[in-house]
Amino acid sequence: MKNSLLLVLSAIVLVFTGCKNGQKAEKDSENPFFSAYTTPFQVPPFDKIDTSHYLPAFVEGMKQHDAEIAAITDNTEAPTFENTILAFDKSGELLTRVSKVFFNVNEANTNEQMQEIAKKVSPLLSKHNDDISMNARLFERIKALYEKRGESGMDAQQVRVIEKYFRDFERQGANLPKDKQDQLRKINEQLSMLSINFGDNLLAETNKNFQLVIDNKADLDGLPESVVTAAAETAKNAGNDGKWMFTLSKPSLIPFLQYAKNRDLREKIYRGYFMRGNNDNANDNKKVVADMVRLRAEKALLLGFDNFAAYTIAENMAKTPANVSSFLDKLMVAAIPVAKKELAEMQKIADLEGATFKLQSWDWWFYAEKLRKQKYDLDENELKPYFSLTNVRDGMFAVAGKLYGITFNKLTDLPVYHNDVETFEVKEADGSHLGILYLDYYPRESKGGGAWCTDFLSSGWKDNKKVDPIISIVCNFTPPTGDMPALLNWDETSTLFHEFGHALHGLFTQGKYTRTAGNVPQDYVELPSQVMENWAGEPEVLRMYAKHYKTGEVIPDVLINKIQNSGLFNQGFDNVEYIAASVLDIDYHLLSPPAIVDVISFEKESMAKIGLIGEIWPRYRSTYFAHIFDGGYGAGYYVYLWAAVLDADAFDYFKQSGDIFNQDLAKSFRINCLTECGNDDGMVQYKKFRGQEPSLDPLLKKRGLK
């Protein structure tokens, strides 16, 4: 692997050194990454960025970063905060610039060229990062400042940055002997490539390798007209005019599972979904998973930890895997009986309809929808006309406006990476510029599944001037069809509010230092996002944005009451499938080398251990668990539930005040939990807002588990 890495690097260098100096200078001047953007608000000039620009920018970015590090280590003066920590904190500007654009676009609008570049550059970046984190001279300077941090006259934030960097270097192998560092380098390089492979395989399995094509209209029985229309359009775009096509993207999959009366076809598409990455083909992820689990276990041992879970969670609010497992066990004990009750109620419906079968996992959505209608007289298709994407978007903007006084102005003249993307300027109450927000709503073959929030430029400071953030929300919502706008179901509505919470976190965060500005423990990260979901379903808020897309009629109270009454609907299923996935994640990362051989057998044993009922699969099975194998959540998928305790407690604080838009609480939450969130430990910052540690009771009540 090391030799191939050198060959790749040599080939890249030859490409550029083979040009005459004049030609190279001309090429450099044409590369948008090689100078500060001249676009409005410093947004990436997507209209000028070509795929050919990425590799040269990565190579030059690493070269410049190396020079910046050398300037620090070659400094003959004694280490100070300014000549070591601050210099390091500000280094790597070009590399960061190209990395943010490349990896964000590769997730949201990829192609074969981008994927090949990712495979080339990932090992180079792994080596580059290891060269820095294992740089003995750099670590010596940081260590010297760390050891004198209490007597140097530095302020609290400077001390915190020093402590963070010192801990980072320790956790990345700076204290290891040379032979152990070489082992760690090899592991990091392999893990970076395996993660790329996992994501590429999953993208192909989800977007290319399965389609359910229907040519008999009778097989569409039960499906809403909007779903049928969308399926016809999908088929037409794929060259199957006159037929109907369903895919594994959630806007296509979930409605089919909810409404299609053809049970055999429900099973077929569901199996297509839960067998992703497990089909013994070129995109099979079983060996990728096994190798990643083994390598992570080896990495943890090298760094002095019993397992990768201990290594990861040590930096989180939970502190230890035992605390996480205890937390998950308590919730599973509460959730399993609720799920079993839901299953019994659905089986009763099926039996009364003359079913001669025991419900299976592919039946859950179909009979859950029937149960919702029976218990709450609530039909999701009755709701969707009130939740057009535009109205939901404007609703979340209005909530942020009432809480924080900010406004969102749509812009049409900024370059974007895809024509579907919308752009907004975000302003403070006084009219000053706060940041830019991109919104990318719809599925496409070039986009990964799910929803996420990222940034093209983080908030910070440069040359004593504030750098304003550029935030992006990426989703996979049901697209518009014909004259019908994009209509969201309740899950999609909650998802948009969720990702918007992340966006607000990115917009509001401030700090002098890159290492601490907005950087919080992983099990705190979902607090800003999940707390926003609470506002989406409040009656006062629903009346602000839930309006019929045809008539403009505000959602009637009868429907609001149904939404409120059905708040506990399907909570057993939702909680059990999530907890099961979290347990699977932790179990993988509690392993010691040589870890596992048979991924599927291990998965079955893990689920049997917690008593998972056969009708529910974990939310993500091993071979498509992108969060932990391609998303930075290894040994950390539990964090959504951990943060749910915080978000339920935080919103309960607003409710107790008698005003969900309480301005004093909103100001305190913004300052302590969003703007200054990286200034201290996560719980310390939360307690500054709440006045006490969070209680588990609001979450249990919210989810019907108490």
Please name every model-derived segment.
Residues T38-H53, F102-V121, A144-K186, T247-K287, ...:
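Short His/Asp/Glu-rich catalytic/ion-coordination signatures at enzyme active sites or charged loops
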